[in-house]
Every structure is written in structure tokens, then in C-alpha cells.
């Protein structure tokens, strides 16, 4: 069933599986995963450039749907691990990777020549910051790599998060490398990744997929490809709109987290329990969305995407977004606030931060995940160490090899009672918070998991 939502604004189309009578969706023109499974996916040669948190799950989904997939990455060590059946990310189990390898439809490679002959190339590479500004170096490099092997009739899709206009920049790179013209010789589109590491409910298949193209033909081809992989496809008329949509999603979240972080600090100074106020506000069934205060934001998206958006505003609207920049400043200041608050609390208990034994619970940026990219918990650990504290951390999701310079422990039984302070930074459900509160001399809770008491203080 193809649903068209009409309004005074540019039209957005939502494409879902139709389980009724035959329609255009059933004929394989556009459809969700359900429709495609009835008519069968036309097997294609698919190259997914970048085999990380975004590219690897997508590559395996494409292989499972019947495509022949090259999972390309310039990291040879990562590719060697993939070839041996060792997944580098938690969202892909080793046995799932091994099954894809044994099925013969997924082949990891670091050799550019293996990209020859692709029908569809999906680019899923990092988009970091360089000196506080967007860095498209990985996209440009991937575009040159893909462009060398681009042939007439192929389709290129960008999934990397970036500012509006990036897909057209990629198009310039592809044209320069291939000698072909986008639209006339090859298709080009943008479909923003929406990966949430560790989320078992919203996966590649179940999360609605926004798709766009530089023209109607490209849009239809992008939609057809993803309709064979996911439950619902959302068509957006222009790539720039889809690019802005992704930045809007994460900027909305980052700004609202900054609001509650700021209000939590104001409420603390005024002697008001902010979390109780937040719970009361969340009882309103309309017009309110609850966000939790914490030690900062992490992951590849939230610390970076708002900066891309504010930079884009400066380039095209006459100035940066003061709201977005202030939100980033508030969120970025939280790790230092945690350390300063902890130092003051220890001082009030007759203990200096320098030389204190500090146990950190959680290093990843979110519960249930081992992803420490841009994690505020890691920054807290580094700041504490710089202040002379003796820091150990426990995070069952984070391998010791990932936590460079931080001592990771597995057994909490002796460390909790021995610590001058236990700091809850990532609220993994596997921690026994009641027992920790009972055994610890002092708990500094940044996540609201332990009830405040004479020995428990909340951020």
C-alpha cells in the first residue's frame, strides 16, 4: 500500500507492505519488505563501503535478502577479522556473520578491485569534525574509490550523516572520477542511517527508512532497493530534505538533553528534586517528551551532528545557530561538572580527590552497549586521572582492548567497599544498584538509578 500524505508543505510518502489485493507494491515497483518477499528480490551486485556500526549490519541484511554483497573497508585488520567470522560490533553476532560468509553472498574485502561490476554502491563512512567543522574527507575518498569503478546504469547511495548538499558534493566527486554524469548515466540518492547500537527492537529491518534521490528515477531505484530490506520506506522528494531530516533528529535530542541538564543543575542549586519534577511532567500525555539528565552525550551522532547543522546555518543562513551551539556547550561541559561536583562531595567528607580511589560504573555512552565513541564516561575517567585520582572502571560490555589507559575490572565484590566513591556513569541493568548502595562508602549517581541518601548523591 502506497500512502501519500498531502499537505501544504512538500509531500512525504510512506511506503508499507500491503497484505491485501495486488497493487503497484506487489508488482515490485515500490514496497516494504513483506511485499518484496512475495515477488522476490532481484539479486544485484551490491558494494557497501564501510563495515562499521552502519555498513556491516546493512551488508548482512542485503546478503540475507538475496543480493551478492562486497563489504569493503580500508581497515585490513578489520577485514581479516570479518573473513574469519569475528564481528567487530555488538549488533552483529559472530554466528550471524559466519552464516553470511558460509552462504557465499557476503564477501568482505579491502581490495578496491573487488568493487568492479557493482549495480549499487552504498557509502557508510564516518563524518567526523575537524577543528570544529564538518570533515567530508572519508566521503570524498569513498566517492573517488567508487567513482573509479562506476559504470553506466549503476546506483550510488550515501548513508553517512552530513549537512544538506553533501550528496551533490559526492555527485561531483563521482563524476570527476568516472567521467559519467549523475542522473543521465548513473543514479544517486541519500538514505540516512538510523542505527541505534544495542537496540534489539529498532534494527535495520524495523526502523523506518528515509530515502531520497537527485531525480525521480534515482528516488524510485533507491526506494526499490531498501523496500526489499526494511519494513517501511519513507520517500522524501529531495536529498537536501532527507539530509536535514537526519540532522534534525539528532539535534532535537541533543538540545532537549541540554535543557534537562541545565534545569537539573538549576534545580539542585535551588534545593528542588529535579527528577521528581521530571517524572511529574512526564505524566502529561500530550505536548511533553521526557529526556533524562546525565553526564553528557556520546556516540558518533549527538556530539557531532548538531555542529554540522550549526555550521551549515552559518554557510547558508548568515550565522550559526546560537541555540544549537549553546546546547553543545552545555552538554560538553557536563563531564567537567561531574568531576568538580565529585571533588566537592569528597572534600565535604574529609577526602581529597587527589589520591582518592574512584570506581566508575559504566564506560560506554549508553546502557546495554559497549560503544565508547565520544563517551562522556571516558572523559570523566581521563579528567579524574588528571586530577590525581586512582581510577578503575567496570563495564561488562566494553572489552579491555577498547578502554585504552583505563583500568577495567570484572569483579565488583571487593572494589565497591574499598572505593572512596562509586560513580554511576552508565546505568547498565546488570549492575546491582541496591547492593552497591548498601556496600559503598559513597555513591555519586549521574543517572538517577540510586535513591538519594546520606551516602548517595545525585548529579
Predicted regions and their residues:
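Low-complexity, intrinsically disordered segments with a bias for serine/threonine
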Residues: 10-11, 25, 40
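Short, intrinsically disordered low-complexity segments enriched in Ser/Thr with adjacent Pro
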Residues: 9-21
